[in-house]
Curated annotation (Swiss-Prot):
It is an enzyme of class 2 (transferase). Keywords: Cytoplasm, Magnesium, Metal-binding, Nucleotidyltransferase, RNA-binding, Transferase. This is Polyribonucleotide nucleotidyltransferase. InterPro entries: ExoRNase_PH_dom1 (IPR001247), ExoRNase_PH_dom2 (IPR015847), ExoRNase_PH_dom2_sf (IPR036345), KH_dom (IPR004087), KH_dom_type_1 (IPR004088), KH_dom_type_1_sf (IPR036612), NA-bd_OB-fold (IPR012340), PNPase (IPR012162). The gene is pnp.
Amino acid sequence: MVHTVQAECCGKTITIETGKIAKQASGAVMIKSGDTMVLVTAVAMKSAKEGQGFFPLTVNYQEKAYAGGRIPGSFFKREGRPSDNETLTCRLIDRPIRPLFPEGFLNDTQVMATVVSADKDNDPAILSMIGASAALMVSDCPFAGPIAGVKVGRVNGAFIANPTAEELEKSDLEIVIAASQEAILMVEGSAAEVSENDLLEAIFFGHAAVQPILAAQLELAKKVGTPKRVILAPVVNEELKARVAALAKEGMKQAVRIKTKVERHLAIDAITAETVAALAAEFEGSEKEVKGFIEDLEYDLVREHIIKDGQRIDGRDTKTIRAISTEVSLLPRAHGSALFTRGETQSIVAATLGTSVDEQRIDSLYGDSRKKFMLHYNFPPYSVGETSFRLAPGRREIGHGMLAERALQQVLPKHDDFPYTIRIVSDITESNGSSSMATVCGGSLSMMDAGIPIKAPVAGIAMGLIKEGDDFAILSDILGDEDHLGDMDFKVAGTAEGVTALQMDIKIGGVTREIMSAALAQAKAGRIHILGEMAKTIAASRGDLSAFAPRITTIWVKVDKIRDVIGSGGKNIRSVTEATGVSIDIDDTGKINIASTNKEACDLAIKMIRNLTAEAEEGKLYMGTVKKIMEFGAFVEIFPGTDGLVHVSELDTERVKNVSDILKEGDKVLVKCIGIDKQGKIKLSRKEALGQTFTE
């Protein structure tokens, strides 16, 4: 049976339908807003795999080219590996739903969102978030939803839910929020140096906006009436648990206070091995359970120490930032470079400047576009003392890179003022928490070192949360273990003036306004401290670019002169690039960017282009080349492709019988423009130029 519900979200209608398509899935919905439609399915296997120790949730998101009326641009003309945008959307869907499955549910579960129709004004990513929740709600999966997503913008001080493409162009923030009826579950987005208070208002505006969508999902689940699977809590061997605590607790109390990550992990591993060995005979085959109880001990001890004593694993209080060191210009051939170290997290970041040829081509549902600023984040296994087989960047690397890219994008100069393609690469060389925020800091430093005129330096910080009942502690600059053992990972980046990017993920049922407000305020204090440390090395962009970076000079020509610059079959522009070695980019407005690392070559190219587009001016002197001798005079080229006639009467002050007595083809001759007729024909005089001095 087909069931349909509708919800109004700030003037837009969202329709969710189930029972018509993909009926063999555990749950399936078609969600629609405007002309955007997404099919979302959820399937969970009937049982878990033998020995499964974690919840294997997979989320896939795919944009079908036909959804935008396009044929894929690849060689095979079909959809291939996920684009960065598709990967990022997978993460948007995954992060708010993952914490809402019960402990003990270890069945393979897959959520698939397929965009089958798309317009520019209704974001399929937002509909996919809602659709994933709705598909799980109508399935038998033990999902503690619903959740809903919304994008919030702000134009002229007014918040907008799910803004159109045109509204987003004018918006000073773009934030995606996922929420339940009671609380915020996830936040991600960027802002143009917006204050913490304004961000908080935007987030809770979004929370209010999704309430009708949540109600519609509950209504749909009630209509469908699929009973949920009953998941029994794992049976705990209380005797074994008590024995593990008796043997390991005192040692673990000391181990979790070891400040250095490697030494701490070695100590915990040693305690685990000793405990497993001590209980092996009495509790045969209990190694996995013992390790689980040790992990539980670590979880409880770390959290208790923070809540009761206000002291963290490495001895810091909740607000202290780890020691920071920074260095720039460490890579002599890079256009800009920085080494950023915070505690045991470290990144080498390099900035490279390019021209329009280096722009990234994006093939999307809505057509081709070009990307002028890119940030690529790499997380090699050695950064955490591990080995692995590395191929393409994973979802995490793409997500962290995009967060840092958004943070820095807000302070870039306008492209008209700084017409370069910019690529930032962050290679994480050590990691113990907050490597994406180290990338933001290092990226800011490397751009200043490269001489990119950014509006202001940007720093980032990762905040954590430990919540026990009504008590909670917010942690500044979290360690990797605090991220793992805590309840929230809240990354905030920005300048001294305001926030440029943020991302929040939680592992509990949601966070309140009080917690979010406190976290944002504490993050601001930490960010200001980090900016101060960065300023000790470099406080503003250098006044000049690296000697190895291309210099781009912009000139303008009249639109009707573009064809003269290009020439037949590109002959003219090719002759300029071959003669000078520069790179030239021309757009249809008459804007020409000339790029070269050699100033003399750039100047010569400009001169050649000026000659190609120059127009004769009456009364002006020109040094020309004789192109053709006629009985009545000589044709002299004063610019490439532009010549004029020197009539025989204008050759000399004396009467000239034969033109060839004065001029020969190929001669250089100084002439003066004495007129231009209505047809544009140029009249030149050698006679009037005699005795005059020519300067270019």
